[in-house]
């Protein structure tokens, strides 16, 4: 089965950029991003940072509200997700932070930026703000990751399993191939918002990103190399800095 599924997955170099976005050619490959421009700009820019596996399309319903309020918006896919490249690297905290910094520099953004991160995007923007406070106007969290295990021993067991080479290799290849042509496990039902992300759109992007080798590899590497389970210290350090911040927890949020 392993050999069969290895052949089935497509080479990431064959990823085709959709018309609604752009590629930024960075050090580790292409980062796919969407740019939303306000008709009444305040001269401020927001970077939207998505979570562990669902790519930047999840921001579709949020971006119009931000642009109507005067903000220019950038939403991008992490490496390994969506339409971005799938580099064979360790997906560490530093890797995500440096990618965001490189994208900001690539887009020639000189002013301080507003950061919004949901789920895993929370620790990314939090660590970025801690390390680059002079670059950040505000940092905002939507259901941020970081409190997944109550005891460190639980996360240690999880990481030991993922560090078994055979398991890592098997999951990285077989899982996306089995799901190839399937749908996102997230089911949407809310339909009050005309700007909402439809179930069909979410499923289409999920199917597309799972066609290519490297999607699940990026997830496994992130779980192994980016401490998403205990980020309390990061949040505590951020709280001591003079950076505007907010946290949102939604009891009816169907994505996070």
Q: Model features per residue range: what roles?
A:
Residues 226-227, 251-256:
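Acidic catalytic loop of the alpha/beta-hydrolase fold
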Residues 241, 247-249, 253:
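Short beta-strand/loop motif that positions the catalytic acidic residue
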Residues 27, 34-36, 40, 68, ...:
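Active-site loop/oxyanion-hole signature of alpha/beta-hydrolase fold enzymes
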Residues 150-152, 170-241:
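Conserved alpha/beta-hydrolase catalytic His-Asp/Glu region
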Residues 117-121, 125:
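Gly/Ala-rich beta-loop-alpha elbow adjacent to hydrolase catalytic centers
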Residues 1-44, 68-71, 232:
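Alpha/beta-hydrolase fold catalytic core
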Residues 130-131, 138-170:
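Flexible "cap/lid" loop of the alpha/beta hydrolase fold
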